Amino acid sequence: MSMFNIVRKEFQFGQHQVVLETGRVARQANTVLITMGGVTVLVAVVAAPTAKAGQDFFPLTVNYQEKQYAAGRIPGGYGKREGRASEAETLISRLIDRPIRPLFPEGYYNEIQVTATVVSSDKTMEADIAAMLGTSAALAIAGTPFRGPIGAARVGLINGEYVLNPNFEQMAQSDLDLVVAGTESAVLMVESEAKELSEDQMLGAVLFGHDEMQIAIQAINEFAAAAGAKPSDWVAPAHNEELRAKLKEAFEAKISEAYTIAVKQDRYAALDALHAEAVAQFVPEEDVDGIADEVDYLFEDLKYRTVRDNILSGKPRIDGRDTKTVRALDVQVGVLERAHGSALFTRGETQALVTTTLGNTRDALMVDTLAGTKTDNFMLHYNFPAYSVGETGRESGPKRREIGHGRLARRGVQAVLPAADRFPYVIRIVSDITESNGSSSMASVCGASLSLMDAGVPLKAPVAGIAMGLVKEGERFAVLSDILGDEDHLGDMDFKVAGSANGITALQMDIKIEGITEEIMEVALNQAFAGRMHILNEMNKVISRARPEISMHAPTFEVITINPDKIRDVIGKGGATIRQITEETKAAIDIEDNGTVRVFGETKAAAKAAIAKIQAITAEVEPGKIYDGKVIRIVEFGAFVNIMPGTDGLLHISQISNERIANVTDVLKEGQEVKVQVQDVDNRGRIKLTMKDIEQA
């Protein structure tokens, strides 16, 4: 009798065969080993049987990790082992988390940990879709109140046709990289970047991916049934309906009034005062029954329902706007004198100070992946300090949220950057959020576009971003443009769109409820387009195209082409020559195999000096031309004269003077500087020189 009780399910998902397996590996957790094409991911789910005492939030943790052995590689670094999560691993952890979190019921506070480990990869495709499907399958057999399963799909657009789960080779030709996740009946999450595609193309990709993932959802359901998955016996905690009614009667109107205060800090102060009043009114001095916790919950629920009811009934939003109006904008560029490019973008109570720095190719980021090390010439770093929301907090490295927001902003900008062969600088953008009340990632997109143009980066088009929200109750719904932080928290959807006037460059969607129809998504996209165009128009009033020249403080870039056979002369023995040029001119030099030489100088003079030295080394000898030379060696039949770096010619004794001389040393000595003319260069590259009829200094 086997010690393993293995359950397997195989199905075809686009161009890939998918195998789900449980019962063989990591049997003390709810584990699924999923193989999709050439990728294998081990997903383990552990759920606590009960919630911790006093727990008032859902502690879900998702950790995605790539083992280097999966691709037959040994990690770098001193310890030669995997370290902290990379940025890519953090982003995929968030990608898995976002569609599963809203499928756990309100009030479920048991801790759940999901660990997805890539254990094998043929390096032809991303492992994120496999990890998401494996997580869905593991949760389906875990016995938790998970309202899944979910499916997930990557959608590309190649030659106008949607492609399901494209590999790396196909993605290189795609105008779209979109990941969509959802249940049988609803889309829950979208993450994408695009090359200025239309709203219809983006919506079509979302619907295509959702239709295709139904195969995976059906297979996971069958897999869970075969594995004997048991339904959860968790029961939602009951709430004190009598207390709910009393709170509503006493505070609904006051809360509604507080939500008309436009200034965030003043509004929060008013709501905190109302909460304290509710506690004083309804919580006894000796609270043995936990009434305080119930008041906290019901008060928050009343706030939630009040704001939503106001919006759906057509009342003004929290800050007095209607559903389509964008907050007041202020656009400034060139705000930092020494930065290569800078912008201060303010939208209501959200503000981003964004800078662009240009560097040479040696400043590029080296990224370690399972497929090997790659170079990234574009970076966008997003920082969200505690002071931006008027709070204190510990300053540390970037958190998951900051990494995710930075990547979204990067997606929004990347499609409009110039090609590397046209603009070979390394670009680093930093977005420091100085104020926040919703949509700071989209403010970062706007600020990035402005600072890039201020730095002189020739963008294909300016880009802007806007965050949309949704409130839906039954058949009634309202789509909100440019949402506040409160509207994000109290709404049913966070829908962020970035793009130019020509089309969408990034789309991110997180939906908290089912029932988001094609109609709602279409309304949201069209409303976002109108908002984006309004923001772009305001930005264009300040700066609409790149400055004609890059910042005077940025490194100067020059490019020349040399004979590929001369590359070794420029580099020199052991790199000595190029190192000497770099040290003398303080310029950075990059040479390609085809003879293209890129020179980055701290100043224009430094770049020109480096180019002059390179041209001196690589110049071709011209017959008939007179050169300043130096005698480097004297022999019986003449002298060898250096006329260019690395280039010597023979000055025969008969060509030293118009008169006959007996000994070379009667006229020349080693180290002597002379003017010589090139008589001839034979087919072996040997150079014949003469001093006859050449006036010497």
Curated annotation (Swiss-Prot):
EC number: 2.7.7.8
InterPro entries, A to Z: ExoRNase_PH_dom1 (IPR001247), ExoRNase_PH_dom2 (IPR015847), ExoRNase_PH_dom2_sf (IPR036345), KH_dom (IPR004087), KH_dom_type_1 (IPR004088), KH_dom_type_1_sf (IPR036612), NA-bd_OB-fold (IPR012340), PNPase (IPR012162)
Catalyzed reaction equations: RNA(n+1) + phosphate = RNA(n) + a ribonucleoside 5'-diphosphate
Stored HAMAP family: PNPase
Domain S1 motif: 624-692
Subcellular location: Cytoplasm
Source organism of this protein record: Acinetobacter baumannii (strain ATCC 17978 / DSM 105126 / CIP 53.77 / LMG 1025 / NCDC KC755 / 5377)
Any one Gene Ontology cellular component term annotated for this protein: cytosol
Gene behind this protein: pnp
Gene3D superfamilies: GHMP Kinase, N-terminal domain (3.30.230.70), K Homology domain, type 1 (3.30.1370.10), Nucleic acid-binding proteins (2.40.50.140)
Binding site for Mg(2+): 488, 494
Stated name of the protein: Polyribonucleotide nucleotidyltransferase
